[in-house]
Amino acid sequence: MALDGELGEQEEEKKKKKKKKRKKKKEEEEEEEGAEKSSSPFAAAMGEDDAALRAGSRGLSDPWADSVGVRPRTTERHIAVHKRLVLAFAVSLVALLAVTMLAVLLSLRFDECGASATPGADGGPSGFPERGGNGSLPGSARRNHHAGGDSWQPEAGGVASPGTTSAQPPSEEEREPWEPWTQLRLSGHLKPLHYNLMLTAFMENFTFSGEVNVEIACRNATRYVVLHASRVAVEKVQLAEDRAFGAVPVAGFFLYPQTQVLVVVLNRTLDAQRNYNLKIIYNALIENELLGFFRSSYVLHGERRFLGVTQFSPTHARKAFPCFDEPIYKATFKISIKHQATYLSLSNMPVETSVFEEDGWVTDHFSQTPLMSTYYLAWAICNFTYRETTTKSGVVVRLYARPDAIRRGSGDYALHITKRLIEFYEDYFKVPYSLPKLDLLAVPKHPYAAMENWGLSIFVEQRILLDPSVSSISYLLDVTMVIVHEICHQWFGDLVTPVWWEDVWLKEGFAHYFEFVGTDYLYPGWNMEKQRFLTDVLHEVMLLDGLASSHPVSQEVLQATDIDRVFDWIAYKKGAALIRMLANFMGHSVFQRGLQDYLTIHKYGNAARNDLWNTLSEALKRNGKYVNIQEVMDQWTLQMGYPVITILGNTTAENRIIITQQHFIYDISAKTKALKLQNNSYLWQIPLTIVVGNRSHVSSEAIIWVSNKSEHHRITYLDKGSWLLGNINQTGYFRVNYDLRNWRLLIDQLIRNHEVLSVSNRAGLIDDAFSLARAGYLPQNIPLEIIRYLSEEKDFLPWHAASRALYPLDKLLDRMENYNIFNEYILKQVATTYIKLGWPKNNFNGSLVQASYQHEELRREVIMLACSFGNKHCHQQASTLISDWISSNRNRIPLNVRDIVYCTGVSLLDEDVWEFIWMKFHSTTAVSEKKILLEALTCSDDRNLLNRLLNLSLNSEVVLDQDAIDVIIHVARNPHGRDLAWKFFRDKWKILNTRYGEALFMNSKLISGVTEFLNTEGELKELKNFMKNYDGVAAASFSRAVETVEANVRWKMLYQDELFQWLGKALRH
């Protein structure tokens, strides 16, 4: 990125060039002085320079402060000087020979120590500071041309500080034709083979020093060593070939912040097909931000304790050590960590040896890793304790957490299922887990739910710690699925890694899909892959992918900011949905064998999507089927969006239907605005499964491959009284529409005997109908007519699908005058089932009895709908339970509905209840309880309390950074707080963007959550005006937000009157 003041620096440099001769003497004096300077580690790092360091800028005003500093005079220059002495004083031939010999010896000496006297990125020129210094030495540089060849000659006057450079690339007129440091990707000329990384952590002032030795293979001759580095203060760089050839002279080095690379400029070209050893000594901060090597804290027995932990994915390893920070550059790692003996350290591999020192420090040396990428390297320094178990194959599994959490047994559930999951994946993939151990680390603060570091997976506490006495089934399910996801990554992502970030779905899509497959292994009765996958993955991502601003699951990465952008729900959830579709049309057993081959062939390496397609095609071929997987799947992965299939009965020919496909877009007007869509007529090869049925019978399933825009097909047994149903059990990633006659027949079937259709088909019909109506493909009454059958529905999934589909419609209508008509209609559909199911017993403890899961989740869903839409009995019950808790100080609220009761009570009752929940939020130590208490505070109808909570959310000592986003989003979902959250978001945007900007996934979640239910012309105008002043990395998220709000406004303009008219008639009959 361009830095402030860059043009001014160039002008100033031109002036300095004119004065160079006059200043030469002064420069040489300053160079000599600079060679002697050193300072204590990061003396000013936490002071004025800290802001510049954190912002990634140089933090310097001196022109060319980043340029290369002093290096020793070359051999040629010394020889020239001695020749002039010979000529001037007519020295004898013997004297000349003696001087020449001396010059040769000096030349060798300078070559050996050349790197020691070179300048450093983030460090200083002309001799290195002592170990631990900050490298703040004078010097700036330019290239001089003389008879002896090119060299970097420093100019005195610059001052480098931690996180800045003391060297900079040459000016435009001096640059070489090809500059490897300006490219997004590393050149590939060099490949790392092995890293020796030695760290010393100073937890008392949150700094660390490091020494990294990298063995690199030179593939193509080059004069530059370019690797990633950011926010590190480099003190010293050395390069050597091997013992026979010795040191390689270094001319200088500089940091290029636009691409976050360290460039080492050499005096000679490295030879291809040779190996070299690069040594870098550096210092850095243990950051307060949640990326790189960062710090977190917790309170134990009234004392605040700190820990250091890493988050390197996708591009943050470079903030902890200079490295080749791209997934393709796999290498082995040997890590050593020196820390105070009061702490323990963890990394990907087990500790091999620990060396204790008399001064209270210890150095842990970890075993060497297998080949791996930098982004899932990890380490941690903490005061935690652990529990452990061992798998059948001998893998040691440990869970590390705060001592009080371990003592309570909060990590026991995670430890238990992790052991089982490793055994499951080893059997399913037929590839053993590759490391001797797997540590699970629960930390108070983390930018994501979890990170799959190989052998050291890191989780935020809320996604791994579970206290059975206060945790609901819903919370247990969340914890389970996060753990299943991360353990899958030990194979998909860690063992086999995508070549580049454009195919991040190859790891995230598989891990997300296996969340449901792995949970089915743990709890077979839950039917996660066949049922819950629909509502939690398919329906959710199709909402996002139905926008004109969506993108393909495989998307180009053209600049550094694009890398963070690819980690979104399209990669995770659409990737998972496409994998599920692929597994279903291939057949699960063939698909499984294909995955086994894929992992075996590419283990410890990298793979691209074509490698997967080829392996799966071969698996099909061995099974006697010939499908070109790449041809089919490229259309689904390289095109954005998805199709809507429309099945029309042919009125002129019996047993004939017409099938059409078109790109589904929620807002048709957005399609005409998007240039990328105007000239594209997307087509997909669609595996359409189809059945014919009537009131008592359903035919066997048939598959039709639809590849054209319009096709005619003959269907057996299709008569006037029969209905058609497409995309059976919603295994395909598309929607299905029908003519109105067929919709009427399907609605009639649901009302007369819904069990003729499977649970998944019933849920699929509900979601398709609501989405098609929202986009204008169907009349608004069709989905509302479908849900009339729900009073007879006994299964959880259709209720869950209906609840999710009604939610955005409710938010579009909840601030309108005649909202009560919609509210009354929904209550009418819920009332019968609410009375039948009742409330859970007080003694229900969230047991994992599989038979109760579906029933308890159904009961919870119906109670939530009843309380949300104002059922009087539900409100009374919630108020009674809250009042009993306050008066008795005993919480007898059933676990599985606590969040509903807390929210309803805060909404209905007075400020004292809000204050009581606020007090309980502060006093509880159970992370699951803390989360639902905080969210309950956002349910208040009191705008003053909501404003108070929004302001408190910015205090990290009160609300954790990752929880603050949820607070703001939940206030925005409250009709009494939507405008407050929207105003707060705009007023505090600079603070929020600074806090979450680099964690783009969190920033996108915040932008979407605050804006998704804005639906007035005024709010749309405010959003567009706000966007005019912002063009940062979250610009794509704002574009999606604008499209969403435009679609909301358009729907209200076109359809709200139609909806209310129908509702009014329906309630009168």
From Swiss-Prot:
Ranges facing Cytoplasmic side: 1-85
- On whether Disulfide bond is a keyword of this UniProt record, the answer is yes
Q: Where is the composition biased (Acidic residues)?
A: 1-11
**Per the UniProt record, which residue ranges are transmembrane?**
86-106
Basic residues compositional bias, start-end: 15-25
The family database entries (SUPFAM superfamilies) matched by this protein are listed as:
Leukotriene A4 hydrolase N-terminal domain (SSF63737), Metalloproteases ('zincins'), catalytic domain (SSF55486)
What is the E.C. number?
Answer: 3.4.19.6
Keywords noted in UniProt: Aminopeptidase, Disulfide bond, Glycoprotein, Hydrolase, Membrane, Metal-binding, Metalloprotease, Protease, Signal-anchor, Transmembrane, Transmembrane helix, Zinc
Membrane topology, as annotated: Single-pass type II membrane protein
Region annotation (Disordered) ranges: 1-46, 117-179
Name the principal localization, coarsely classed.
membrane
Q: Where does substrate bind?
A: 449-453
A single GO CC term for this protein reads: extracellular space
Q: Which InterPro entries match?
A: Aminopeptidase_N-like_N, Aminopeptidase_N-like_N_sf, ERAP1-like_C_dom, M1_APN-typ, Peptidase_M1, Peptidase_M1_aminopeptidases, Peptidase_M1_dom, Peptidase_M4/M1_CTD_sf
Q: In which tissues is it expressed?
A: Predominantly expressed in brain.
The stretches that face the Extracellular side, renumbered to this chain, are 107-1069
Q: Which GO terms describe its biological process?
A: cell-cell signaling; peptide catabolic process; proteolysis; signal transduction
> How the cofactor binds, per note?
Binds 1 zinc ion per subunit.
- Per UniProt, the ranges with Gly residues bias are 121-136
Please list the residues that bind Zn(2+): 485, 489, 508
Query: So which residues have sugars stuck on them?
Result: 134, 205, 220, 267, 383, 650, 679, 694, 708, 729, 845, 951
What cofactor(s) does the depicted protein rely on? Zn(2+)
- GO MF terms, alphabetically ordered: aminopeptidase activity; metalloaminopeptidase activity; peptide binding; pyroglutamyl-peptidase activity; zinc ion binding
Summarize subunit and interaction data from the UniProt record for this chain: Homodimer; disulfide-linked.
Function of the molecule: Specific inactivation of TRH after its release.
* UniProt-recorded name of the protein: Thyrotropin-releasing hormone-degrading ectoenzyme
Per the UniProt entry, what species is this protein from, by scientific name?
A: Homo sapiens
User: Gene encoding this polypeptide?
Assistant: TRHDE
